[in-house]
Amino acid sequence: MAITDTEFHQLADDMFQAIENAIETAIDEQDADVDIDASGNVLQLEFVDGSKIVINKQEPLHEIWVATRFGGYHFGFVEGKWMDGRNGGEFMPFVQESIERQGGIKLSF
């Protein structure tokens, strides 16, 4: 079943907030060095080496797009989960792994 624009934004905003909270915890507990910039439909993480992970909402498609230094990924809401259309991976574990791989920061959700 398709989700409405309102549902899409609520689900995406909840995920963005969970990521921000986990990063803030990592900064406090691990002395992680990462900058968070949340602006509109975009959440951008910049690591000490200058690399970035950009997560953005694609409202017309009801997708979340993620760009890492390893590639770009598109996640759609399928059966209650955000899933990658190419490889079937789930969004939050993917983001957790990407942040650890790219920035060396272990997140807990």
UniProtKB/Swiss-Prot annotation:
The protein's job, in short, is:
Involved in iron-sulfur (Fe-S) cluster assembly. May act as a regulator of Fe-S biogenesis.
GO annotation, cellular component aspect: cytosol
Matching entries from NCBIfam families are given as: FeS_CyaY
Name the Gene Ontology molecular function terms of this record.
Answer: ferric iron binding; ferrous iron binding
UniProt keyword annotation of Repressor present:
no
What Gene Ontology terms for biological process does this UniProt record contain? iron-sulfur cluster assembly
Any transmembrane segments, and where? none
What PANTHER family does the record point to?
A: FRATAXIN (PTHR16821), FRATAXIN, MITOCHONDRIAL (PTHR16821:SF2)
Q: Which UniProt keywords apply?
A: Iron, Metal-binding
Q: What InterPro entries does the entry give?
A: CyaY (IPR047584), Frataxin/CyaY (IPR002908), Frataxin/CyaY_sf (IPR036524), Frataxin_CS (IPR020895)
The protein's name in its UniProt record: Iron-sulfur cluster assembly protein CyaY
Q: Which protein family is it in?
A: Belongs to the frataxin family.
SUPFAM superfamilies referenced in this protein's UniProt entry, alphabetically:
Frataxin/Nqo15-like
